[in-house]
Amino acid sequence: MQYPEAIAKLIESYSKLPGIGRKSATRLAFYTLGMSDDDVKNFARSLSASKSDLTFCRICGFITSKDDDPCVICSDESRDQSKIFVVENSQDEMAIENTHDYHGLYHVLNGVLSPMEGRGPEDINITSLITRLSDHSEVKEVIIGLDASTEGEATTLYLARLIRPSGIKVTRLARGLSVGTNVDYADQLTLTQAVNGRTEI
């Protein structure tokens, strides 16, 4: 027996989310059906607004309101302009920022190199990073804080090779993060130790 088309489409939509399999998608679809009309409308409005009202900062790539571009961190002149922390996504930036121990700038790649998925240097924010570094001589250190995964490691080494000839110091997070650990899943103490104990590449 098949579900009605509307439910089947809802299940299919949920199953496109990362980490959501068919069973979880079905559970979410039926949970949604049990929500009040107002809650469903608010949920739909929030989804729509997340696409229509948000953009990526034109300087660093962080997710921001279209009314706040550049983002609040890039616009904050009190930040340490000599350091740029490179992360994979906006969640990772928030995780680092919430340690309250880093006060420099950021650059969000919005992805990592992944030949298996057909994602090369031109598909993530690498060119904008190199341009940013060449345009801002005050930058003295680039901290690379990517996940401890095969793709994260490959991207880290690729960036280091690109940046080092400019004379800018390139460092990476200390190995407090075990292999396979996502930056945004690490606790604040571990992240603080990883940032403070960073090593030069």
From Swiss-Prot:
One of its GO terms (molecular function) is zinc ion binding. Keywords: DNA damage, DNA recombination, DNA repair, Metal-binding, Zinc, Zinc-finger. A zinc finger (C4-type) spans 57-74. Pfam families: RecR_C, RecR_HhH, Toprim_4. It comes from the Bacteria. Residues 82-178 form the Toprim domain. One of its GO terms (biological process) is DNA recombination. Belongs to the RecR family. May play a role in DNA repair. It seems to be involved in an RecBC-independent recombinational process of DNA repair. It may act with RecF and RecO. This is Recombination protein RecR. It comes from Oenococcus oeni (strain ATCC BAA-331 / PSU-1). The gene is recR.
